[in-house]
């Protein structure tokens, strides 16, 4: 519906009613210079057709650069059917389906999502989602402190290889709850937790140990060794995992001798497009004995009086709408619409399709690393296995190089010097199945040119 402003007659009547001659008189307390400075450049009003034409011209100026940025959000292909189904009227609501008899479709979909995530992580139960990966990790830390009955400590070992934004969010959420985060050291040669350096923590009690897989740098952690070490201290293990990577890697429930206790992470790679930081969704799964400490909604399957299968929200006594301040979490209405898309996405791909996405992403990243490290001065920051992200050192400041790449239609990675300045100029680069060999060649050529240009400026 077009916006129809007040008529001149209506404006006159309103001004007369308040005793003002002109609209400008309403703003006479603001100096005229300040008022005009911000509106002089605003063009005259347009009608609806003119605005439509202007927007089309503006849209035609947009370009879609080749994205080699990962760092927690990934440019995967999303089949057209995913959002065509997700935005149907039957699903197009994020609200919690309290009224089970009128919400069987939504409840079954959430149950299927939980089943898929349990299978993917190798753990018994899943919730129906959390807000995003960072808050999912924070909830996992809170849950682990509650659930660990063997250790009364409120200390959690948080490796430096966890996403720095995740660490900040967790610190913010647990700061006033008496929980202490202790940083685990990083092996700078391979970009992952150094198991040998953990010996100094063996006499210290921890409620939980966080293990990312793959970690922020794309490196694969020694999860079996780390899990057994943590359990040897009676600490719970929190796995932070990219769900796409789990299509190829050992699921957290099978890490070490006993498996991880909690798995969580960012669900964006499962059918959610990149969108200025969100909305995305977080996931969390856990062992059977910890289900009553799980935050968020849980959908269960049962049968009615006539023996028909039915779905309903279950174990609701954990939640804030019943327990209030004693609830496991204050999350209520969750990211249901994003979960709908993820469920459709996983259903369309299937287990083999998701594994193929993961495998091709790894292959594209290997090709990317090979092409970029052939450039003089570009080298891998770490040795060791990786999934689909790799840090590379470059011989020029990333803050100078990245704008040059953007001008060539390439989003050239994440500037690691923002969080890890001690490593010098470095980029965290990523390739998914959507990147082509031609785009990788274009990235390599653009990076080589950018480094030559920065080198010439430095010599001048």
UniProtKB/Swiss-Prot annotation:
It comes from the Bacteria. Its EC number is 1.4.4.2. The keyword Oxidoreductase applies. It catalyses: N(6)-[(R)-lipoyl]-L-lysyl-[glycine-cleavage complex H protein] + glycine + H(+) = N(6)-[(R)-S(8)-aminomethyldihydrolipoyl]-L-lysyl-[glycine-cleavage complex H protein] + CO2. One of its GO terms (molecular function) is glycine dehydrogenase (decarboxylating) activity. One of its GO terms (biological process) is glycine decarboxylation via glycine cleavage system. Signal peptide: none annotated. Pfam families: GDC-P. Keywords: Oxidoreductase. Gene3D superfamilies: Aspartate Aminotransferase, domain 1, Type I PLP-dependent aspartate aminotransferase-like (Major domain). The keyword RNA-binding does not apply. The glycine cleavage system catalyzes the degradation of glycine. The P protein binds the alpha-amino group of glycine through its pyridoxal phosphate cofactor; CO(2) is released and the remaining methylamine moiety is then transferred to the lipoamide cofactor of the H protein. Belongs to the GcvP family. N-terminal subunit subfamily. This is Probable glycine dehydrogenase (decarboxylating) subunit 1. It comes from Halorhodospira halophila (strain DSM 244 / SL1). The lineage of its organism: Bacteria, Pseudomonadati, Pseudomonadota, Gammaproteobacteria, Chromatiales.
């Amino acid at each position: 519906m077009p916006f129809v402003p007040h008529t001149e007659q209506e404006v006159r009547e309103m001004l007369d009613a308040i005793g003002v001659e002109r609209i400008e008189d309403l703003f006479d307390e603001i100096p005229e210079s300040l008022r005009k400075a911000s509106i002089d450049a605003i063009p005259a009003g347009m009608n609806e057709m003119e605005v439509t034409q202007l927007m089309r011209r503006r849209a035609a100026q947009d370009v879609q650069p080749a994205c080699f940025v990962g760092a927690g959000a990934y440019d995967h292909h999303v089949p057209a059917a995913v959002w065509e189904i997700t935005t149907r009227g039957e699903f197009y609501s994020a609200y919690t389906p309290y009224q089970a008899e009128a919400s069987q479709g939504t409840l079954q979909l959430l149950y299927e999502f939980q089943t898929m995530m349990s299978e993917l992580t190798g753990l018994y139960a899943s919730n129906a989602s959390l807000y995003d990966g960072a808050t999912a990790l924070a909830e996992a830390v809170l849950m682990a402190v509650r659930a660990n009955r063997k250790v009364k400590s409120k200390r959690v070992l948080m490796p430096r290889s966890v996403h720095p934004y995740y660490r900040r969010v967790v610190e913010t959420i647990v700061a006033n709850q008496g929980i202490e985060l202790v940083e685990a050291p990083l092996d700078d040669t391979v970009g992952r937790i150094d198991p040998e350096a953990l010996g100094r923590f063996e006499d210290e009690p921890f409620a939980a140990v966080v293990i990312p897989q793959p970690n922020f740098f794309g490196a694969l952690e020694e999860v079996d060794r780390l899990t057994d070490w943590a359990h040897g201290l009676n600490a719970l293990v929190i796995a932070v995992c990219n769900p796409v990577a789990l299509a190829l890697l050992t699921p957290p429930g099978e890490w070490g001798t006993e498996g991880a206790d909690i798995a969580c992470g960012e669900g964006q790679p499962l059918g959610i497009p990149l969108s200025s930081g969100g909305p995305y969704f977080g996931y969390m799964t856990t062992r059977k004995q910890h289900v009553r400490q799980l935050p968020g909604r849980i959908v269960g399957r049962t049968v009615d009086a006539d023996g028909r299968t039915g779905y309903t929200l279950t174990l609701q006594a954990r939640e804030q709408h019943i327990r209030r301040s004693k609830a496991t979490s204050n999350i209520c209405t969750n990211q249901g619409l994003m979960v709908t898309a993820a469920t459709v996405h996983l259903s369309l791909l299937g287990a083999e399709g998701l594994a193929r996405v993961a495998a091709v992403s790894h292959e594209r990243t290997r090709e990317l690393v090979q092409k970029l490290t052939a450039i003089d001065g570009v080298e891998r920051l770490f040795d060791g296995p990786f999934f689909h992200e790799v840090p590379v050192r470059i011989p020029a400041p990333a803050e100078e190089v990245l704008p040059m790449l953007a001008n060539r239609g390439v989003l050239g990675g994440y500037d690691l010097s923002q969080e890890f300045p001690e490593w010098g100029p470095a980029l965290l680069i990523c390739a998914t199945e959507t990147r082509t060999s031609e785009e990788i060649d274009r990235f390599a050529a653009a990076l080589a040119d950018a480094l030559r240009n920065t080198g010439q400026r430095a010599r001048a």
